[in-house]
Every structure is written in C-alpha cells, then in structure tokens.
C-alpha cells in the first residue's frame, strides 16, 4: 500500500544519515 511505500522512503532517508 501507499503507507508501506512511504515507510520505505523514510527508512532510506534514515540510512543515509547513518
């Protein structure tokens, strides 16, 4: 669903921070 896709994007952004 759209929620899952949004979550994946947020996770990617967090990974960039690490």
UniProtKB/Swiss-Prot annotation:
<dbReference type="GO" id="GO:0005576">
    <property type="term" value="C:extracellular region"/>
</dbReference>
<keyword id="KW-0964">Secreted</keyword>
<feature type="modified residue" description="4-carboxyglutamate">
    <location>
        <position position="4"/>
    </location>
</feature>
<feature type="modified residue" description="4-carboxyglutamate">
    <location>
        <position position="13"/>
    </location>
</feature>
<dbReference type="GO" id="GO:0099106">
    <property type="term" value="F:ion channel regulator activity"/>
</dbReference>
<comment type="function">
    <text>Conantokins inhibit N-methyl-D-aspartate (NMDA) receptors.</text>
</comment>
<keyword id="KW-0528">Neurotoxin</keyword>
<keyword id="KW-0800">Toxin</keyword>
<keyword id="KW-0872">Ion channel impairing toxin</keyword>
<keyword id="KW-0301">Gamma-carboxyglutamic acid</keyword>
<dbReference type="GO" id="GO:0090729">
    <property type="term" value="F:toxin activity"/>
</dbReference>
<feature type="modified residue" description="4-carboxyglutamate">
    <location>
        <position position="9"/>
    </location>
</feature>
<protein>
    <recommendedName>
        <fullName>Conantokin-Gm</fullName>
    </recommendedName>
</protein>
<dbReference type="GO" id="GO:0035792">
    <property type="term" value="C:host cell postsynaptic membrane"/>
</dbReference>
<keyword id="KW-1028">Ionotropic glutamate receptor inhibitor</keyword>
<keyword id="KW-0629">Postsynaptic neurotoxin</keyword>
């Amino acid at each position: 669903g759209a929620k899952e896709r949004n979550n994946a994007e947020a996770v990617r952004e967090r990974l960039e921070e690490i």
